A protein has these predicted regions:
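Extended intrinsically disordered, low-complexity coil regions enriched in Ser, Thr, Gly, Ala
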Residues: 121-133, 137-145
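Extended hydrophobic-aromatic, low-complexity segments
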Residues: 100-101, 114-115, 128-129, 141
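Short Cys/His-rich local motifs and their 1-3 flanking residues in nucleic-acid-associated proteins
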Residues: 108
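Short functional micro-motifs and their immediate structural scaffolds
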Residues: 111
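Short, cysteine/histidine-rich loop/knuckle motifs that typically chelate Zn2+
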Residues: 105
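Flexible coil segments in periplasmic/lumen-exposed cytochrome c-class electron-transfer proteins
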Residues: 1-101, 138-180
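Short cysteine/histidine-rich zinc-coordinating motifs and their immediately flanking basic loops
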Residues: 115-121
Length: 180
């Protein structure tokens, strides 16, 4: 691609309206699920029902048939997170809660990223937890990974879940997208 073609592509994709991919829902119970195709899918029929969420994140397709069978790239997902996790995550993200650094210092005021530092707003909470855990344990390697080690050093698994719930609930410009 030429420089002009790259600029044209960047302009085109940059002009597209941001579309939420994950809807965050705080809850005490979640649909019972099975794992298929790397996804949590709600059980149907006699096996269907609810179970306590505990300290988990369950990401499932909004419309199982569209996602699993039709492979609709716009069907979206719902991320179930424990009740209260968004508020706890907000405290960790916005002021560090004496455990970590305020995320906006590097990731921007609206958590949309700054320069080479990636955005966090609206990302899959499961993905965010995995990245935080991998940086804490040293599994994640990369140019910027070492900068995150002191940031994640004191975080517990629950802290990571709460941070991920909050960041996933944020949209462009810091708008809340969570449901209760």
């Amino acid at each position: 691609m030429s420089d002009d073609e790259i600029k044209a592509a960047a302009t085109y994709f940059g002009s597209m309206k941001w579309t939420p991919w994950i809807r965050v829902v705080e809850t005490d119970t979640v649909p019972k699920t099975r794992i298929a195709g790397g996804m949590f899918l709600a059980l149907e029929g006699a096996e269907a029902g609810k179970e306590p969420i505990g300290q988990r994140i369950i990401e499932a397709p909004e419309k199982t048939e569209e996602t699993e069978l039709l492979r609709n790239p716009r069907s979206g997902f719902v991320a179930y997170v424990p009740t209260g996790s968004i508020k706890k995550g907000e405290a960790l993200v916005t002021n560090g809660a004496n455990k970590t650094t305020q995320c906006a210092v590097c990731h921007g005021a609206d958590l949309e990223g700054l320069g080479p530092v990636p955005g966090l707003a609206g990302r899959s909470p499961s993905y965010v937890v995995r990245q935080l855990h991998d940086m804490q344990t040293g599994v994640r390697k990369g140019t910027w990974s070492d900068l995150m080690k002191p940031v994640v050093a004191k975080l517990t698994a629950e802290d990571m879940l709460n941070i991920a719930a909050y960041t996933a609930s944020r949209g462009p410009g810091g708008a809340s997208r969570s449901a209760r």
